[in-house]
């Protein structure tokens, strides 16, 4: 996932809710 919000199912703060 790509983004800046900790949303999307991943635990990293670099994940986005897009994926």
From Swiss-Prot:
Keyword Secreted: yes
Main location: secreted
Segments passing through the bilayer: none
Superkingdom per UniProt: Eukaryota
Keywords attached to this entry: Adaptive immunity, Blood coagulation, Coiled coil, Disulfide bond, Hemostasis, Immunity, Innate immunity, Secreted
Post-translational events: Conversion of fibrinogen to fibrin is triggered by thrombin, which cleaves fibrinopeptides A and B from alpha and beta chains, and thus exposes the N-terminal polymerization sites responsible for the formation of the soft clot. The soft clot is converted into the hard clot by factor XIIIA which catalyzes the epsilon-(gamma-glutamyl)lysine cross-linking between gamma chains (stronger) and between alpha chains (weaker) of different monomers. Forms F13A-mediated cross-links between a glutamine and the epsilon-amino group of a lysine residue, forming fibronectin-fibrinogen heteropolymers.
Biological process annotations from GO: adaptive immune response; blood coagulation; innate immune response
Gene Ontology CC terms, in alphabetical order: extracellular region
Subcellular location: Secreted
Summary of subunit composition and partner proteins: Heterohexamer; disulfide linked. Contains 2 sets of 3 non-identical chains (alpha, beta and gamma). The 2 heterotrimers are in head to head conformation with the N-termini in a small central domain.
Function of the molecule: Cleaved by the protease thrombin to yield monomers which, together with fibrinogen beta (FGB) and fibrinogen gamma (FGG), polymerize to form an insoluble fibrin matrix. Fibrin has a major function in hemostasis as one of the primary components of blood clots. In addition, functions during the early stages of wound repair to stabilize the lesion and guide cell migration during re-epithelialization. Was originally thought to be essential for platelet aggregation, based on in vitro studies using anticoagulated blood.
Domain remarks: A long coiled coil structure formed by 3 polypeptide chains connects the central nodule to the C-terminal domains (distal nodules). The long C-terminal ends of the alpha chains fold back, contributing a fourth strand to the coiled coil structure.
Protein name: Fibrinogen alpha chain
């Amino acid at each position: 996932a790509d983004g800046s919000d900790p949303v999307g199912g991943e635990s990293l703060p670099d994940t986005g809710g897009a994926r």
